Amino acid sequence: MRETLYFKDDDSRLSFLQGNYVTLTNMSDHDIDRICRYHLSPINISFQTMNPDLRCKMLNNRFAGEALKKVDILNEAGIRMNGQIVLCKGVNDGKELEFSIQKLMEYLPNVESVSVVPVGLSKYRDGLYPLEPFNAQDAGEVIDLIEKYQKICMEKYGTHFIQASDEWYILAGREVPEEERYDGYLQLENGVGMIRLLLDEFHDGLERRITEKQSGAGLPWEGIREISLATGKLAFPYLKRMSEEVMQEYPGPVSYTHLRAHETCADL
């Protein structure tokens, strides 16, 4: 067979090589032994919940709860792990989320970080579990709970450990945290800290450009430049804000900024 056909989406090798998240349900004892023997880490794990019964229900797999015992083996072997919890309203949020956070803290420092991300919903859900989207109030409650445990983890372990993805802050109408709260952006590819990193890199670049312009060291920005930015709905306010900041520094020949947020399939 083709080489790529030897890999499944839930294959631990993809987690090590490409950062994929695995549920552990498809991992045999041989797979776990191989990870421990060769010390393949970090391994990214989709926990969803630390409640075994609820995990079986969420993953529609009667072995999903039992699979959590594999985390104990990996932890004892010193395997570094990162985790994610895909949050579903009325299912694994609230008290269940708090329970999961508390249980995952027991695996520090080998579990280095855990991100909490909202479940992605589309209109194509015929025959699927009737999930509801989170609203602004829900997002605020999720953030408050996460930030509560960030303070606890920082005081006890010197790390914020549990992270809220950018969507929560945008949905709640809150500013994203400062860079220090992301612990080196361990969950960047999972949508945690992307907005903060973008803002900080943008402002660093803009300040450098302004300094060059004032000193005459940089190349002059002459003529009219038309720039198109393609973005989704969630990131649109930030792109608009940054474009307006550029316009304040270069109001000359370019007299306006026009951005439009187009609908996408994911509605993001």
Question: Predicted segment positions?
Answer:
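Structural motif
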Residues: 166, 229-235
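Hydrophobic beta-strand segments of well-ordered beta-sheets in folded domains
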Residues: 43, 224-229, 253-255
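Conserved Radical SAM active-site core
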Residues: 1-110, 121-149
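Short, solvent-exposed amphipathic alpha-helical segments in soluble enzyme
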Residues: 61, 242-251
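Hard-cation-handling environments
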Residues: 143-225
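Conserved small/polar residues in nucleotide/adenosyl-binding loops
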Residues: 257-264
